[in-house]
Amino acid sequence: MVKQIESKTAFQEALDAAGDKLVVVDFSATWCGPCKMIKPFFHSLSEKYSNVIFLEVDVDDCQDVASECEVKCMPTFQFFFKKGQKVGEFSGANKEKLEATINELV
């Protein structure tokens, strides 16, 4: 399951609640073509990797979160571990790289 993040507080709470689990965050926008293309794949990964937390942040709805995380383009995927420490990031709708990065970190 992918959790939709609606606020900066909700983002921080989700990172805190994850504990030692890997958190994968998809920063996207409704108007972004590549974001729309990779969204179903991102959701399928959430079913496949049940021990990983998947979050979605709409950069238009949560500009403060996107700004704090220094998101410059969409889609951007960020990976967090252990109490919100960022351990990886890449931009672009690259399915293979997304799954490979999860496998490296999990």
From Swiss-Prot:
PROSITE patterns in UniProt: THIOREDOXIN_1, THIOREDOXIN_2
Modified residue annotations for N6-acetyllysine: K3, K39, K95
Primary localisation category: nucleus
Modified residues (S-nitrosocysteine): C62, C69, C73
UniProt xrefs under SUPFAM superfamilies: Thioredoxin-like (SSF52833)
Compartments where found: Nucleus; Cytoplasm; Secreted
Keyword Nucleotide-binding among UniProt keywords: no
Keywords from the UniProt entry: Acetylation, Activator, Cytoplasm, Disulfide bond, Electron transport, Nucleus, Redox-active center, S-nitrosylation, Secreted, Transcription, Transcription regulation, Transport
Site residues, Deprotonates C-terminal active site Cys: D26
Site (Contributes to redox potential value) location in chain: G33, P34
UniProt-annotated catalytic positions: C32 (nucleophile), C35 (nucleophile)
Residue ranges of every copy of the Thioredoxin domain listed in the record: 3-106
Summary of the function given for this chain in its UniProt record: Participates in various redox reactions through the reversible oxidation of its active center dithiol to a disulfide and catalyzes dithiol-disulfide exchange reactions. Plays a role in the reversible S-nitrosylation of cysteine residues in target proteins, and thereby contributes to the response to intracellular nitric oxide. Nitrosylates the active site Cys of CASP3 in response to nitric oxide (NO), and thereby inhibits caspase-3 activity.
Record-stated family: Belongs to the thioredoxin family.
Name of the molecule in the record: Thioredoxin
